[in-house]
A protein has these predicted regions:
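Outer-membrane beta-barrel domain signature
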Residues: 54, 80, 104, 137, ...
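Outer membrane beta-barrel transmembrane domains
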Residues: 661, 747-855
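Periodic glycine anchor positions in long extracellular repeat architectures
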Residues: 2-4, 9, 22, 31-33, ...
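Surface-exposed loop/turn positions within long extracellular repeat scaffolds
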Residues: 24-28, 49-50, 74-78, 97-103, ...
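Feature marks extracellular polysaccharide-active and adherence modules
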Residues: 4, 14, 33, 43, ...
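Extracellular beta-solenoid/beta-roll
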Residues: 289-290, 299, 307, 313, ...
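Outer membrane beta-barrel translocator domains of Type V secretion systems
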Residues: 520-720, 832-835, 839-846, 852
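Residue-level detector of the transmembrane beta-barrel scaffold of outer-membrane proteins
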Residues: 89, 418, 584-588, 628-632, ...
């Protein structure tokens, strides 16, 4: 029967009545759209049966069959062709069913066939299935187009094989989406002898039973993309991509493809010379999952591209002749013991090992500026290595001892090695790069301490072992520190300077490593001649941070420390008639510059501190004597700079603190007559501290100081005239200080503990001053003083259990010069300049100004 022989025709089976079910049986050939336009509608349970059927028979014809609703069926015992030479459309929906022995979409040149299978329960059942027939004329334009759309839960069941793009110059396309399913019992050919594509998205399902092929002939260009969460392709046997032609398989955005079983399945790329087979794991977003045992590359151009922005595990083994690229910004973690030949290029993101042997020992690796090769703490062997990016040795859990062996040559294109080292002595556990060939170029090394406490070294801790010519330059990026010690990178061991390797040493020699000018000659073995001359032990190199910690401790102990006259000036200026006050308030400011000498004979320490302190007091007359009792508070800040005299590295210390205290002073006499005094004070200080070493993180911690002082003096007149008297006042003072500090764990991992710094300091001195007797106001009372401070505060810092002392000189000698001034009724001021000096180049210069008002 022919529908649409020359003019438009319509056959409607089923109508619109509920439960109606027109039936039509045709034992011959059914043609819809022979030379004109024809259409068949099968709905509402209508049934159609035929032996053979063609939709869109001749050139220029248009045929269409629409079958919908549950119970509607079309049965073809032999073949069903949609688009023979013309244009054909078959639309199956809403639970309808169609079956055919053989099914073809776009059978010949000029044909165009479209199949749509839509809806839950909608089924197309076929034997052999073909999409895109085409022509045997190799010079013809691309024609013979077929397209199948399966979505919304629709199902296509193919008991035979399925061929997409089966004849030259044809084009076959399949789209499976939103829960659509295509089940193929035998082989799926995508691009059998022409162009074909399959796209599975949004939870679509594709199943094939026997080995499947993508680009199965030299004329074929074909691709399969499985994309989106829930989208899968399950192949029971194996998949061949680009066996003879140009084929690509893309798995992305959470999709999954299985090729055989994870134990013995495989995916084959590029079967013969001249073919191209590409596996794309991702297209820049999320990756997909490939479940198979191996990805094999054969004789042609086989490539695997990892182009994703997420973290993804890849478990199949990569083997054979393959070129591998890591493109996207994400991380690929490998669990196969890969042995492929060909290049590995990491252009972006991270190429990471999940097991030992994950990186192919037969592949030359190229790490571009945006890429990272991550050993994850697992030993690896590779071919040659060109590093313009990052090679990371440690695992996420830390630790050290990972080795990367480069069987060929190594070239550093300004790249970086991230290495963990348990920084200690020569035998410290360390990550290591072993190059069996030659080295060239420039490479930076960043070292992270893996729990080492620091130690003196002799030969050094080897990081790079070079078997060939060692013309490459390795530079330490940042710093390598542990405990008290600083490590630097040197070429050659201390006793084997020409061995070509690179070593970390804590060595105080102020000689920088020398850049090599050419290949180094390996040392000759000993010949039993003259005995070796013993080499003296290496002096370890101290880092400057201990000086900053000690400087902060010293600043905290000394910031608010002083004498009674430092604090309130000359009380006698308040005691003349007309100036006597019951109450008083005062303020003083002090600035000091302290050089505490070299710590460990390597680190110079300088501290600048500024203080403002104020107080209020009340006077009590007790018999012939008087007592001043008051409160005081203060704020101060200090900056310390520790500079290594060997490495010139610096560490900055900062202290800012607040102080509160009480004091009481007893004077033997109420008047200005000379006599004795006793001063007692207690003080509590609290400090915020910072230490910031060059190229290290900023450390913060708190500290506290409690101190008490008792001081006594007696003024004796030594000469007098009608206008002036001169007095000498011997003095003695005892100060107790108790320093406490939080522990610090630095970003480098070093544990820092500051000593308590408690102890007694004594002062013995004398003050010589003159006093005007004219009775005029605005008197000036100059003075000079000398003091001997003894005992001092024992400063100490322990870093990873190793202590470094910063004890001040036991004897410090001080000289002062200044004056007190009477400014007016109740007002007085004082100023002074002081200099302290002790052993170990200790120097302290300070000056202060004070102002007091009594009423």
């Amino acid at each position: 029967m022919r529908i649409g022989l020359q003019t438009a025709s319509l056959l409607n089976l089923g109508g619109t009545s509920a439960g109606s079910g027109a039936k039509w049986s045709n034992s011959g050939k059914l043609m819809v759209g022979v030379a004109g336009e024809g259409k068949v509608d099968i709905t509402a349970g209508g049934t159609l049966s035929s032996a053979q059927a063609t939709i869109g028979k001749d050139v220029g014809s248009k045929g269409g069959v629409w079958i919908g609703d549950a119970g509607s069926t079309w049965t073809n015992s032999k073949s069903l062709i949609v688009g023979d030479h013309g244009s054909g459309t078959l639309n199956i929906s809403s639970g309808a069913r169609v079956s055919a022995g053989t099914f073809m979409l776009g059978n010949y040149e000029t044909s165009d066939g479209t199949l749509t299978v839509d809806g839950q329960g909608t089924i197309l059942e076929t034997g052999l299935f073909g999409v895109g027939g085409g022509t045997n004329n190799s010079t013809a334009d691309v024609n013979g187009k077929g397209a199948m759309y399966v979505y919304g839960g629709g199902t296509v069941k193919t008991s035979g094989s399925a061929i997409i793009g089966q004849i030259q110059n044809s084009q076959g396309d399949v789209y499976i989406t939103t829960g659509g399913l295509w089940e193929i019992d035998k082989t799926l050919y995508v691009g059998s002898d022409s162009n074909g594509s399959v796209l599975v998205t949004a939870g679509g399902l594709l199943k094939s039973g026997e080995a499947s092929c993508i680009a199965c002939s030299s004329n074929a260009n074909a691709s399969v993309q499985i994309s989106g969460s829930g989208s899968t392709w399950t192949e029971a046997d194996h998949i061949e991509v680009g066996f003879f032609g140009n084929g690509a398989l893309t798995i992305d955005d959470g999709a999954r493809v299985s090729s055989g079983t994870p134990e013995d399945g495989y995916l084959l790329l590029s079967g013969v010379a001249g073919s191209t087979g590409v596996l794309n794991m991702g297209v820049g977003g999320l990756s997909g999952t490939l479940e198979t045992a191996e990805v094999r590359g054969r004789e042609g151009d086989a490539r695997v591209n990892f182009n994703h922005g997420d973290f993804s595990e890849f478990k199949p083994r990569l083997t054979g002749s393959l070129n591998v690229s890591k493109i996207g910004s994400g991380s690929t973690l490998l669990f196969g013991r890969n042995d492929y030949t060909g290049e590995t290029r990491v252009e972006g993101g991270t190429w990471a090992a999940g097991i030992e042997g994950a990186f192919s020992a037969s592949s030359n690796h190229f790490i571009d500026a945006g890429g990272q090769l991550d050993l994850m703490g697992l030993n690896q062997n590779i071919g040659a290595l060109n590093n313009s990016g990052v090679v990371s040795f440690p695992s996420w859990q830390g630790g050290a001892g990972t080795q990367l062996t480069v069987n060929g040559d190594y070239y550093g294109g300004g790249g970086l090695l991230l290495m963990n080292v348990a920084l200690g002595a020569d035998n410290s556990l360390a990550d290591r790069l072993v190059v069996n060939g030659d080295t060239n170029g420039v490479t930076n090394i960043q070292v992270r301490n893996a729990g080492g406490s620091g130690s003196a070294t002799e030969q050094g801790i080897q990081l790079v072992d070079v078997g060939g010519a060692s013309a490459g330059v390795f530079k330490l990026q940042g710093r390598a520190v542990a405990g008290l010690y600083e490590y630097r990178l040197y070429q050659g061991g201390r006793d084997t300077p020409n061995d070509g390797g690179w070593y970390l040493r804590s060595q105080a020699d102020p000689v920088d490593p020398v850049d090599p000018v050419g290949p180094l000659v390996p040392p000759s073995p000993p010949d039993g001649g003259e005995p070796q001359v013993p080499v003296s032990p290496t002096t370890p190199l101290l880092r400057p941070e201990p000086a900053a910690y000690l400087g902060n401790q010293l600043a905290a102990l000394r910031m608010f420390q002083g004498t009674m006259h430092d604090r309130v000036g000359e009380q006698a200026l308040d005691s003349r008639p007309g100036s006597i006050g019951t109450y008083g308030s005062w303020v003083r400011v002090q600035s000091r510059n302290l050089n505490s000498g070299a710590i460990g004979e390597q680190i110079g320490v300088k501290t600048n501190a500024d203080v403002v302190q104020l107080g209020a007091e009340r006077r009590f007359d007790v018999g012939a004597s008087r007592v001043h009792a008051g409160v005081m508070a203060g704020y101060g800040h200090a900056n310390t700079r520790g500079t290594s005299q060997v490495s010139q590295l610096q560490a900055q210390g900062k202290v800012s603190g607040k102080s509160i205290g009480l004091y009481s002073t007893w004077f033997q006499r109420q008047t200005t007559q000379p006599g004795a005094y006793i001063d007692v004070s207690v003080r509590y200080d609290r400090y915020d501290n910072q230490v910031n070493g060059d190229a290290l993180g900023r450390e913060r911690y708190d500290s506290r100081v409690f101190s008490g002082s008792i001081e006594s003096g007696y003024a004796l007149q030594i000469t007098a005239s009608d206008l002036n008297k001169v007095y000498i006042e011997p003095q003695v003072q005892v100060v107790y200080s108790d320093f406490r500090s939080d522990d610090v764990v630095e970003t480098s991992g070093t544990h820092v503990r500051l000593g308590r710094g408690d102890g007694l300091t004594t002062r013995v001195g004398a003050r010589l001053y003159g006093r005007e007797l004219s009775g005029m106001r605005n008197r000036v009372q100059p003075f000079v003083a000398i003091n001997w401070w003894s005992g001092g505060d024992d400063l100490a810092v322990a870093m990873d259990g190793q202590s470094l002392g910063g004890s001040l000189p036991k004897n410090i000698f001080e000289s002062k010069v200044g004056a007190q001034l009477e400014l007016g009724p109740g007002w007085s001021a004082w100023g002074q300049f002081a200099h302290q000096q002790g052993s170990r180049k200790y120097r302290d210069f300070n000056g202060q100004l004070g102002l007091k008002f009594s009423w």
